[in-house]
């Protein structure tokens, strides 16, 4: 029997080696097929004409079946960030901080609930058909894993950047498979509460809202009342500016005074008005910064030269009203949600004609003409049914014209809105 067993072992080994040797070409062929399918879909999307409403706003409709339940009984939690990469892979953060007691269960402590729901990886990537291609990350994944996850960006070089807003959170760089590569650092000392100092560029808090400029190899970070730009490879500081392009040393470190809401736009303020909630860059070299405290987008050139202000739903009570009049995600539930500028995405048509503004205050996505700043229309509306929105806190677009939204608080989901074609 021993010679027979040996012969069988040799045969199995040879077959295994054959499978391994064939696996890489098969994977490469699959990747090539996906790229070809993506190019074909992009061509078809460009050839079709998207339907418009009477005001010239492009029309969208929700796909009520996308993405469907997550695999492995993973619990869908707060979707705080979404990014669609150059291959139309949708990356999103599934932050479990606000999980209810009945939403994540099972394990050793609750074996009687194993059929219910489990904690998922906190970084998930799926294709346009909701097939999961990557999933990794949590507090056990890396010792400095962000506790206040806010932003995920997958660059075209094959790396994924993750950042959070907790005091000790920074920006971490991983491979697409989740292998750690680099830590931006610049954390304050443990347990030290930093006082606002808008001229300080070496030690930073709340670095979780950032953007990458891969052409210039730069990281844009917003916090307090400024934009800071660092080298994307070395982390060295390069430049920064405040509201309307003011120098860092001229930015006030005092709180922006609240105002009495009267149904009109907040009083004009040259400084950025916290919370600064997003920063995006366009292909023609413009930088867009959203201020939840002012219902305003300030537009700049990359050197910090101010270009224009864009107000959206300016009559909305702004976050500048303060905590006595505005709700938080987990606190002051009896109060309304304040502010418009939660996140923003830029359309991926060749001219990048539209800004899509995710507005939690009005549970809507506003469609804005990028060059004129004119609001053309909106979709959404408060609720938890498909196509409605509640505490929207993330938005992204792909090359096919789809819009992806993420919700926090108790909504806890990601949705896909598809173009309506004529």
Language model feature labels by segment:
Residues 18-21:
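C-terminal motif of bacterial Sec signal peptides marking the signal peptidase cleavage site
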Residues 1-8:
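Bacterial N-terminal signal peptides that target proteins for export
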Residues 23, 28-30, 41-422:
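Eukaryotic scaffold repeat domains enriched in small/polar residues
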Residues 34-38:
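Intrinsically disordered, low-complexity repeat regions of secreted/extracellular protein precursors
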Residues 8-16:
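Hydrophobic helical h-region of N-terminal Sec-dependent signal peptides
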